Regions:
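ASCE P-loop NTPase motor core, strongest for the SF2 helicase catalytic module
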Residues: 1-157, 164-170
């Protein structure tokens, strides 16, 4: 939040926070507490109300919405250029085939951040999906990543990496 407060002074573009529905108002509370000067907007309500709010994005420094509402409203967000985009609880995009993952990758932001305490639970696909949001293409296409890294690790062709992976999963 301190970072957002500082950035808002330097760049007029809005910043986007996408989080689970249960955390939307936590973000509001934290902004009020630590950066009361920030102009923030919570995008919620019915379709008409959200559409109206989204048309006002440029009046705010921080926009907060949830994964489910972003999925419903992505057509309104696609033309908006954000300064920074933060995914809170980024494990919500761990499945690269999920609507959440596909939707957030349509957003336009100068920089993207994934906030998570659980980057990977079951497979390297999960890590790839989060990295592909933050740095698109850095870990190759999903197919190439699987062929180059995931399958050899699963087949035990890279014992050193597998050891670290097992330690992380436990």
């Amino acid at each position: 939040i301190a970072f957002l407060d500082d950035e808002a002074k330097q760049d007029p573009l809005p910043n986007l926070v996408v989080c689970p529905t249960s955390l939307v108002y936590n973000w509001e509370d934290e902004i009020k507490r630590f950066a009361p000067n920030l102009r923030y907007l919570i995008v919620s309500g019915n379709v008409a109300a959200r559409k109206e709010l989204i048309h006002q994005l440029s009046d705010y420094q921080v926009i907060i919405t949830s994964y489910p509402l972003l999925r419903k409203d992505i057509s309104y967000y696609q033309d908006v250029q954000f300064n920074h985009c933060f995914l809170d609880e980024a494990q919500y995009i761990k499945n690269p085939s999920s609507l959440n993952a596909k939707t957030v990758k349509l957003l336009r932001a100068k920089t993207r951040y994934a906030l998570t305490g659980t980057p990977m639970e079951n497979s390297l696909d999960e890590l790839w999906s989060i990295f592909d949001f933050v740095m698109p293409g850095m870990l190759l296409s999903h197919y190439k990543f699987r062929e180059t890294y995931e399958i050899p690790i699963i087949k035990d062709e890279n014992k050193a990496v597998k050891k670290k992976l097992i330690k992380r999963i436990k």
